[in-house]
Curated annotation (Swiss-Prot):
Name recorded for this polypeptide: 3-isopropylmalate dehydratase small subunit
GO biological process: L-leucine biosynthetic process
Catalysed conversion reaction: (2R,3S)-3-isopropylmalate = (2S)-2-isopropylmalate
Cited SUPFAM superfamilies: LeuD/IlvD-like (SSF52016)
Functional summary from the UniProt entry: Catalyzes the isomerization between 2-isopropylmalate and 3-isopropylmalate, via the formation of 2-isopropylmaleate.
Entry EC no(s): 4.2.1.33
Alphabetized InterPro entries for the sequence: 3-IsopropMal_deHydase_ssu, Aconitase/3IPM_dehydase_swvl, AconitaseA/IPMdHydase_ssu_swvl, IPMI_Swivel, LeuD
Annotated keywords: Amino-acid biosynthesis, Branched-chain amino acid biosynthesis, Leucine biosynthesis, Lyase
Gene3D superfamilies: Aconitase, domain 4
Originating organism: Pectobacterium carotovorum subsp. carotovorum (strain PC1)
Pathway membership, UniProt: Amino-acid biosynthesis; L-leucine biosynthesis; L-leucine from 3-methyl-2-oxobutanoate: step 2/4
Quaternary organization: Heterodimer of LeuC and LeuD.
Assigned GO CC terms: 3-isopropylmalate dehydratase complex
Family matches, as NCBIfam families: leuD, PRK01641.1
Length: 200
């Protein structure tokens, strides 16, 4: 996976709480098991007025011209709730998002995000309120998300955030479960050499 140390990106405000995984990527688009191709269906029922996805909803925030190319999603509490599907972070990253900022996340979505190099940043309700006001008052604003120093730079203010040290290490070094295993390849090989033949 790609390393994540710091990201500067355009912020799009999705002013909704309890955004569930079926809203993020509706079930009819879950036929594939590869990670690509889901971005076009992200928030399908909100982005489009028709089932075929040919008529964009001009009122939906992702369809606003000044948010084209956004890579940081600002949302409300309990983001990613609902059924467990890894396709949700797949759709977000395939669309181009690198970071989701919210007061809270559903546990399974939170874990799946790290596994797919999508950084979920938890800030307080009050801090998220401030960020919504900032974005609403200044369309096209960029935030700097610094994972190494665990801080979001938004305008003239900095917002520190907490993150598990192991997950932080994995994202900074671009490590998934396979990458973590390969870090210990020499030790694994040495261990296998010392095992009885019938165990190999």
């Amino acid at each position: 996976m790609a390393k994540f140390t710091q990201h500067t990106g355009l912020v799009v405000p999705l002013d909704a709480a309890n955004v569930d995984t079926d809203a993020i990527i509706p079930k009819q688009f879950l036929q594939k098991v590869t990670r690509t191709g889901f971005g076009q269906h992200l928030f399908h029922d909100w982005r489009f007025l028709d089932d075929a996805g040919q008529q964009p909803n001009p009122e939906f925030v992702l369809n606003k011209p000044h948010y084209k190319g956004a890579s940081i999603l600002l949302a409300r509490e309990n983001f990613g709730c609902g059924s467990s599907r890894e396709h949700a972070p797949w759709a977000l990253t395939d669309y181009g998002f690198k970071v989701v900022i919210a007061p809270s996340f559903a546990d399974i979505f939170y874990g799946n995000s790290f596994n797919n190099q999508l950084l979920p940043v938890k800030l307080s309700d009050e801090e998220v309120d401030e960020l919504f006001k900032l974005v609403d008052g200044q369309e096209g604003i960029n935030f700097i998300v610094d994972l190494e120093n665990q801080v979001v730079q938004a305008g003239s203010k900095s917002y520190p955030f907490e993150i598990d040290s192991f997950r932080r290490h994995c994202m900074i070094n671009g490590l998934d479960s396979i990458g973590l295993t390969l870090q210990h390849e020499a030790s694994i090989t040495e261990y296998e050499k010392n095992q009885p033949a019938f165990l190999n």
